[in-house]
């Protein structure tokens, strides 16, 4: 909203009404020692024209995917967003709607959320989904807590192949709740199965995996799930929704709870947010799900309608006994997800996934032919891959930047042992010419 300062007359009226003689008297309780004595050094205000130009100059200092060709991924992905997504999002009834506190009045909003839940269930092969989470990381943390609640156990196994920042969020959520987190090492870019099997026992609530994982590799979900289930634990999978256009659904692979980052559908990079998380599970765990759930029903006249259902799980009903303290969702971002995926359809999603897979494999193959460059891990991957290089990754990225190319992520930031490794991502937005230009640029670096 606009900020309109009070006039001197208005200030006097307010002070008189509350029985105070001056602003100084109003703030008399604040000690002089903590008050700012000097005036803030704030420049004079700008006209609208001046402000637009100033903000334009400021924005021009950023390096965006509009001007640069980017091969960064690692949880935030550049995908083509059809124009129909933003056009439908701009409808005022969607744009201004928040989480429905008088839900039955907001039938349109509830239906949109219901459609989102339906799509998530179809993608993941699960029985129920919620209205969305803050992001993929918080969704994974909530799924871990669900597992502990369902099994009455206080230990989870977390492979190092899960996104490092997801693991940070897991620690933030779980450690204060007394949940033990045991990290499992990786072998050839995927979960070390032997180490996992040794760590598994009847105290483990769940094994968490990400597939495709942080390195882009496809994990052996069926094998891992069988090991977890044999000890009475659950399998929680974090997935990239685009990959599900080609890969088997987590439900088919034996997952009990599925989460993911929904940003790849309908949501631009946005400098890291806002994004949305999705969370789905098998029917037996639905009552343990966090957040809002929209259900379809019929009114007394037999007309179809939508309601918030199973609300006894939620904070506004049970307070400290709630399944989670999340009391919101990412409805607008989830709507963008829903519109984009609905427009794609099954065939469109499959084609999108195929393009991501093929272009990434072409890029990995061509870069691997360069002297001093090789694919770090052997095994199936989706649209991200790790390159081992004899040249400094920092030097490579600085050289590529001069060609208006944003290179891969330097993995030493998260994995000190991978100090000569770069994580690249290739999506459908890259042409063969783009990839060839990347390869040529890397080939020039000595």
Swiss-Prot record:
Gene3D superfamilies: Aspartate Aminotransferase, domain 1, Type I PLP-dependent aspartate aminotransferase-like (Major domain). It is an enzyme of class 1 (oxidoreductase). Its EC number is 1.4.4.2. Pfam families: GDC-P. PANTHER family: GLYCINE CLEAVAGE SYSTEM P-PROTEIN (PTHR42806), GLYCINE DEHYDROGENASE (DECARBOXYLATING) (PTHR42806:SF1). The glycine cleavage system is composed of four proteins: P, T, L and H. In this organism, the P 'protein' is a heterodimer of two subunits. This is Probable glycine dehydrogenase (decarboxylating) subunit 1.
């Amino acid at each position: 909203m606009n900020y309109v300062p009070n006039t001197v007359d208005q200030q006097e009226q307010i002070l008189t009404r509350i029985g105070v003689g001056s602003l100084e008297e109003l703030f008399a309780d604040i000690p002089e020692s903590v008050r700012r004595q000097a005036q803030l050094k704030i420049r004079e205000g700008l006209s609208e024209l001046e402000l637009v130009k100033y903000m334009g100059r400021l924005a021009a200092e950023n390096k965006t995917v509009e001007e640069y060709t980017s091969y960064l991924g690692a949880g935030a992905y550049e995908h083509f967003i059809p124009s129909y997504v933003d056009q439908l999002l701009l409808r005022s009834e969607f744009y201004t709607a928040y989480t429905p506190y008088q839900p039955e009045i907001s039938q349109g909003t509830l239906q949109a959320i219901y459609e989102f839940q339906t799509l998530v269930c179809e993608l993941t092969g699960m029985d129920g989904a919620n209205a969305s989470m803050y992001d993929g990381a918080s969704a994974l943390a909530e799924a871990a807590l669900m597992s502990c609640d369902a099994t009455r156990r206080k230990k989870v196994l977390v492979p190092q192949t899960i996104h490092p920042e997801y693991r940070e969020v897991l620690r933030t959520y779980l450690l204060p709740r007394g949940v033990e987190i045991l990290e499992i090492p990786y072998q050839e870019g995927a979960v070390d199965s032997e180490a996992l099997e040794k760590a598994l026992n009847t105290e483990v609530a769940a094994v968490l995996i990400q597939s495709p994982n942080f390195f882009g590799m496809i994990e052996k979900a069926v094998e891992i799930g069988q090991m977890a289930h044999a000890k009475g634990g659950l399998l929680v999978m974090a997935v990239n929704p685009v990959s599900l256009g080609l890969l088997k659904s987590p439900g088919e692979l034996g997952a009990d709870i599925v989460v993911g980052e929904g940003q790849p559908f309908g949501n631009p990079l946005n400098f890291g947010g806002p994004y949305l998380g999705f969370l789905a599970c098998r029917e037996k765990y639905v009552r343990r799900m966090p957040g809002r759930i929209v259900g379809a029903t019929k009114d007394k006249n037999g007309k179809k309608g939508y309601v918030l259902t199973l609300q006894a799980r939620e904070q506004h009903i049970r307070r400290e006994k709630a399944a989670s303290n999340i009391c919101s969702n990412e409805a607008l971002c989830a709507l963008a997800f829903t519109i984009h995926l609905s427009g794609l359809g099954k065939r469109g999603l499959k084609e999108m996934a195929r393009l991501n897979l093929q272009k990434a494999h072409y890029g990995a193959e061509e870069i691997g032919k360069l002297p001093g460059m090789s694919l770090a891990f052997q095994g199936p991957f989706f649209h991200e891959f790790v390159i081992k290089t004899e040249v400094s990754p920092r030097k490579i990225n600085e050289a590529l930047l001069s060609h208006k190319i944003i290179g891969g992520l330097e993995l030493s930031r998260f994995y000190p042992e991978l100090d000569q490794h770069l994580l690249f991502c290739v999506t459908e937005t890259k042409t063969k010419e783009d990839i060839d230009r990347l390869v040529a640029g890397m080939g020039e670096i000595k």
